């Protein structure tokens, strides 16, 4: 959604805090770095919400090279330790996770949406402008299907599209638990990693499992070098 304004970055730095910003391309990353952003979050097209078109495995090393030595976090498709290991093998100094928290026990995700996510595969998401006016990855639903029809007007740009759809979304979410029509319409932002989010876990267990799998992946690769 753009580079943070200079006055905002200065204010945060004056408070002794760091600034991080998302990017979907090397050129966006360069703008962030030149503006004084401390951490670049390179988010691939697999990610939920607003995202670019370039896949994570291609994007991460490009951004790392573009902004070095500014630290980069890999994002987009991160929900397992092996994916974390892949990001760090490609030069990232850590990872940024979003979607994986939406089905945790602590998440305040709409109950119907959470059930949809738990049942979804990685093919059940798409990039749509139907909620915000900008391309954003979300669950496919009757809502996205209707907006994609050839006889439907194109979504308005941001911020007009959210103004247009906010009341409808509010009513859909309120009715989704008791009305099958609303249940088909309800959706939310989520990345392709949703296909691995098939059970409800605590946030603690998500972190624990990710770290354990990361260690196993790194040790397996190290063992191959020893052989």
Tell what function each PLM region has.
Residues 1-73, 80-99:
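Alpha/beta enzyme core
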Residues 58-73, 79-227:
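Conserved active-site-proximal phosphate/metal-binding subdomains
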């Amino acid at each position: 959604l753009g580079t943070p304004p200079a006055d905002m970055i200065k204010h945060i730095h004056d408070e002794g805090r760091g600034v991080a910003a998302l990017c979907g391309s090397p050129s966006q990353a360069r703008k962030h770095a030149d503006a004084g952003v401390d951490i670049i979050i390179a988010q691939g097209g697999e990610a939920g919400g607003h995202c670019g078109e370039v896949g994570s495995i291609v994007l991460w090393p490009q951004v790392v090279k573009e902004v070095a030595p500014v630290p980069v976090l890999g994002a987009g498709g991160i929900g397992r330790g092996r994916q974390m290991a892949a990001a760090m093998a490609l030069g990232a100094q850590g990872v940024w996770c979003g979607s994986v928290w939406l089905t945790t026990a602590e998440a305040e995700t709409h109950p119907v949406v959470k059930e949809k996510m738990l049942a979804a595969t990685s093919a059940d998401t798409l990039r749509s402008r139907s909620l915000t006016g900008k391309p954003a990855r979300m669950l496919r639903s009757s809502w996205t299907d209707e907006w994609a029809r050839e006889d439907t007007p194109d979504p308005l740009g941001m911020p007009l599209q959210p103004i247009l759809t906010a009341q409808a979304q509010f009513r859909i979410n309120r009715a989704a638990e008791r009305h099958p029509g609303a249940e088909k319409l309800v959706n939310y932002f989520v990345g392709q990693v949703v296909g691995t989010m098939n059970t409800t876990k605590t946030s603690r267990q998500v972190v624990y499992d990710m770290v354990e799998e990361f260690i196993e992946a790194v040790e397996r690769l190290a063992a191959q070098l020893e052989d």
